[in-house]
Amino acid sequence: MEKNFYNIDEQRRWNEDYMWEREGHEWSEVFGGTENLWNKEIFPYVKEFRNKNILEIAPGRGRITQFLSVLASELTVIDLNPTCIEITKNKLGSHVKNYIVNDGKSLTGVYNNSMDLVISWDSFVHMHKNVIEEYIKEIYRVLSPGGKSFIHHSWFQQGSEYSTNNVAGRSNMTPELFTELINNYGMKVVHQFNVSFPEVTDTITIFQK
């Protein structure tokens, strides 16, 4: 039976209950490890933001954060789970400028027009559409003019041929619907492509303010 993470309370409970024995690196195995994931699936699309202000939403235990902290001039991380923030801070310390605990749908504590890049990996795939829309509204607020966002989200429609493959708690979202939400806030998609896992297909959407 699939597990639904996209309710904020459920996501909070899951974060508290999950053992994190491998610090999230188990989810990188399909890419040949976390370093390969970064080098092949993420870095080519964010390397232009070297020495820029970057915000990461839902860093977990810092799996991707470790690379972003080297790339960015100033890195801010924001997460629903205080334990994740604490552990990431213990790992990376002053290499991350700001550590923020949020409510799972807003970017309170991040200034308007202050970020050149907003990025999230492995979290939006579990979020309900309404939560994603709240985040998109907030991403628009914090991005600097011309700034970009790199979001890994699900490509799953309940009741479609893909629904039988939803064994990873994917929320109902499609590239088309994600694009519509972005356009509603005056932003535009600059690149969109799929990432295939053994059991599901997800989408990366890169959009610009």
Regions found by a protein language model. Give the residues of each.
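A short glycine-rich, Lys/Arg-flanked "PGG" loop and its adjoining helix->strand segment in the class I
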Residues: E133-P145
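A short SAM/SAH-binding and catalytic strip from SAM-dependent methyltransferases
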Residues: L117-N130
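A short acidic, Gly/Pro-enriched loop at the edge of an enzyme's catalytic core
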Residues: T108-V118
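Class I (Rossmann-like) S-adenosyl-L-methionine-dependent methyltransferase catalytic domain
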Residues: M1-R50, I57-T108, M127-E134, K148-K209
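S-adenosyl-L-methionine-dependent nucleic acid methyltransferase catalytic domains
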Residues: M115, R141-S144, N184
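Conserved acidic functional residues
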Residues: T65, N112, D122
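Structural signature of beta-strand start/N-cap positions in the alpha/beta core
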Residues: N53, E74, S114-D116
